[in-house]
Amino acid sequence: MAMKKLLIASLLFSSATVYGAEGFVVKDIHFEGLQRVAVGAALLSMPVRTGDTVNDEDISNTIRALFATGNFEDVRVLRDGDTLLVQVKERPTIASITFSGNKSVKDDMLKQNLEASGVRVGESLDRTTIADIEKGLEDFYYSVGKYSASVKAVVTPLPRNRVDLKLVFQEGVSAEIQQINIVGNHAFTTDELISHFQLRDEVPWWNVVGDRKYQKQKLAGDLETLRSYYLDRGYARFNIDSTQVSLTPDKKGIYVTVNITEGDQYKLSGVEVSGNLAGHSAEIEQLTKIEPGELYNGTKVTKMEDDIKKLLGRYGYAYPRVQSMPEINDADKTVKLRVNVDAGNRFYVRKIRFEGNDTSKDAVLRREMRQMEGAWLGSDLVDQGKERLNRLGFFETVDTDTQRVPGSPDQVDVVYKVKERNTGSFNFGIGYGTESGVSFQAGVQQDNWLGTGYAVGINGTKNDYQTYAELSVTNPYFTVDGVSLGGRLFYNDFQADDADLSDYTNKSYGTDVTLGFPINEYNSLRAGLGYVHNSLSNMQPQVAMWRYLYSMGEHPSTSDQDNSFKTDDFTFNYGWTYNKLDRGYFPTDGSRVNLTGKVTIPGSDNEYYKVTLDTATYVPIDDDHKWVVLGRTRWGYGDGLGGKEMPFYENFYAGGSSTVRGFQSNTIGPKAVYFPHQASNYDPDYDYECATQDGAKDLCKSDDAVGGNAMAVASLEFITPTPFISDKYANSVRTSFFWDMGTVWDTNWDSSQYSGYPDYSDPSNIRMSAGIALQWMSPLGPLVFSYAQPFKKYDGDKAEQFQFNIGKTW
């Protein structure tokens, strides 16, 4: 074999040998050491080809090119006559990647970061990249206060030049803050300043926000909080001079020292606005008014800038620039604020597009828009469209993106990006209580039928005491102006005695039609007509029931077990809704008020009216809306007209998952008081507790609920982040702690006539319960679990601590 002459060795592992400036002509190229990399692929990555004249520089470029592929650990190029011999050592191939000891960082996140760096199964192992990843992960742990953490890559060789890569984590413990010192503060105590920090050196048990575990990011946020605290109180020259963070020798403790210069308090002497105001100087002037002698306030200055931007944004100036420059006068301790405004170009909307609505038709979304195509861009109108889409309840998230049109100086496209949720639900409910046992209900509801926006529902109940069926359809846009049209058909066969209610049977059917009229963005009115037929039978003689029958001109017998009565009623139905919730499902901010009522009209057998008012208010207590306080109320009242009473079967009831949890459904409130009758199979001593006056059985009280013509229910709820749930599912699961209270009463009950019996006209007989609830927007529909313990109840009340329902949320 001819003697091989070394041309150039690896740039990393050996020095270059100059062969000659004149070079030589390459007749052939051979490779040694290739295993996984194909010869053709290696040749394509080289700048040298057969027939080329090469010199030292060409060889250097060849080695660089081969190294740049990332496939080789070592590259040597030698000459054998006119043949170029390339000796390579391939990097090993990664056969598997595993992790050990990582608790703070999930495997999926690690895999994503590794893949972003080109480290994945089947690729070559780059030890330099692995070293960078080790350092990056350790830096991450240091940033969250885990200074004893270490990350080591363990590479295990395998046959055929393969390796197993294992990242071994030793996370250690988070360093806890031992002390936070603020040096230079005179106007405020250190405790007062630290009380606004997230990081604390002491955290009382009730503080769910404070944290002793050091995190670099949280410290940066706390320093900004400190700066804002002073700037908001007039200290215009406040400065954070330095911050020292020192570790204890065992790396488990942190001492933080913040050196500040407070300076003096300054007052605003005036605001001067200049620049391109786009003809809105008067409106901008209103936004920049200040009170004489008002302290300089950094937050108010920022808000003023934002308000000016929002104002201009409403008129199509999508990208205004607003810059405030404080002019400080140290002599008289005043600040003059100079505000420079550049409105920029006015933009018009070329197109409004929707993304992510795979089920919902574009027209369903487009009709909720307040921003029009071809008109100037109004930021408030774009936001209104987002709010309206959220309130539909069809989408889990709604985001907006304003995109400039390429090549156009004054046009944009507005894109609404939605993530659809399952708007259909299979409504299945189950409850269990010591007295009630197990109860069921079922139904199907689709709020966005075939993507048209129609709400279609088929609901039914079949159990020991009820057979109920209902078909409902609502078109929210019966007209282009947003007038809605809804209709309903129903049938109900109700055996009250089997439902622990007052004994009677009611077979009813009916229909109603309702029109809805939008008043403005948040208010709407409803009006409609209804018809219902009631066929009552098996009415046991009971005081409230007989009182109603007497008012209707009936004279039922207390000795007859089969009293019957039929009515046909026509009603005028009305309603009003105010809805300013931020979302249709799982809202976190805003209020909703719903008033519904009905009154009989001429041609009806009954004469009565009935009104119900529901309210709900959500108040977020953090910026991310993860901690929310919810207050709900329900008020109901009804009464007869023209000397008649409201039918007993229209009474209000309370108890159950939608009113007062922890109590069996519909069992709160007045109980039946029966008249003893003469039937041979009737035994009042067995069936009821009867009062005896002058040796006669006069009245018998029971635990059978009869409801009342008045109701009041309230609930206070504290919504919290759900433990062990990732951010991905945060919008689908909700956990809350609640306190429910409610009562039902009968304003027509005359307690003076029924001494020895509870006063069912007293509204102060309030029931209370407390517990925890979990709601989940599952593929079947909304699932609601609750466990409640009644802590204020009365004789005859029936507890049902655990309740489970599919198809109902609040």
Swiss-Prot record:
Protein name: Outer membrane protein assembly factor BamA
A GO BP entry: Gram-negative-bacterium-type cell outer membrane assembly
Signal peptide: 1-20
Transmembrane segments: 425-433, 436-446, 455-462, 466-475, 484-495, 505-506, 523-535, 564-577, 591-600, 609-619, 629-639, 709-718, 733-745, 768-777, 779-789, 804-808
Extracellular side: 434-435, 463-465, 496-504, 536-563, 601-608, 640-708, 746-767, 790-803
POTRA domain location: 24-91, 92-172, 175-263, 266-344, 347-421
Periplasmic side: 21-424, 447-454, 476-483, 507-522, 578-590, 620-628, 719-732, 778
UniProt keyword Ubl conjugation present: no
Consequence of changing residue 351 to P: Reduces cell growth, wild-type protein levels
Effect caused by changing residue 181 to A: Lethal, protein does not accumulate
NCBIfam families xref list: OM_YaeT (TIGR03303), PRK11067.1 (NF008287)
Phenotype of the disrupted gene, per the record: Deletion is lethal. Depletion results in the accumulation of incorrectly assembled outer membrane proteins, including TolC, OmpF, OmpC and OmpA. Decreased expression leads to decreased susceptibility to contact-dependent growth inhibition (CDI), and decreased expression of outer membrane proteins (including in this study LamB) as well as up-regulation of periplasmic protease DegP.
Entry remark concerning the domains of this protein: Contains 5 N-terminal periplasmic polypeptide transport-associated (POTRA) domains which interact with other subunits of the complex, may recruit substrates from the periplasm into the outer membrane and also act as a chaperone. The C-terminal region forms a discontinuous 16-stranded beta-barrel transmembrane region. The central pore is ellipsoid, and probably closed by extracellular loop 6, perhaps with the aid of other loops.
Quaternary state and interactors: Part of the Bam complex, which is composed of the outer membrane protein BamA, and four lipoproteins BamB, BamC, BamD and BamE. BamA interacts directly with BamB and the BamCDE subcomplex. The Bam complex has the shape of a hat, with the BamA beta-barrel crown in the outer membrane and the periplasmic brim formed by the BamA POTRA domains and the 4 lipoproteins.
InterPro entries to which the protein is assigned, alphabetical: Bac_surfAg_D15, BamA/TamA_POTRA, D15-like, OM_assembly_BamA, POTRA
Outcome of swapping residue 251 to A: Lethal, protein does not accumulate
Mutagenesis or variant effect for residue 464 to L: Very minor growth defect
Primary gene name: bamA
Places the protein is found: Cell outer membrane
The protein's role, per its UniProt record: Part of the outer membrane protein assembly complex (Bam), which is involved in assembly and insertion of beta-barrel proteins into the outer membrane. Constitutes, with BamD, the core component of the assembly machinery. Efficient substrate folding and insertion into the outer membrane requires all 5 subunits. A lateral gate may open between the first and last strands of the BamA beta-barrel that allows substrate to insert into the outer membrane; comparison of the structures of complete and nearly complete Bam complexes show there is considerable movement of all 5 proteins. (Microbial infection) Acts as a receptor for CdiA-EC93, the contact-dependent growth inhibition (CDI) effector of E.coli strain EC93; antibodies against extracellular epitopes decrease CDI. Its role in CDI is independent of the other Bam complex components. Is not the receptor for CdiA from E.coli strain 536 / UPEC, which does not have the same mode of toxicity as CdiA from strain EC93; the decreased expression of bamA101 in some experiments decreases the level of outer membrane proteins in general.
Transmembrane listed as a keyword: yes
Record keywords, A-Z: Cell adhesion, Cell outer membrane, Membrane, Repeat, Signal, Transmembrane, Transmembrane beta strand
Effect annotated for changing residue 373 to K: Lethal, wild-type protein levels
Family: Belongs to the BamA family.
Pfam (any one): Omp85
Outcome (variant: residue 661 to A): Slow growth on solid and liquid media, less protein accumulates which is more proteinase sensitive
Gene Ontology CC: one annotated term: membrane
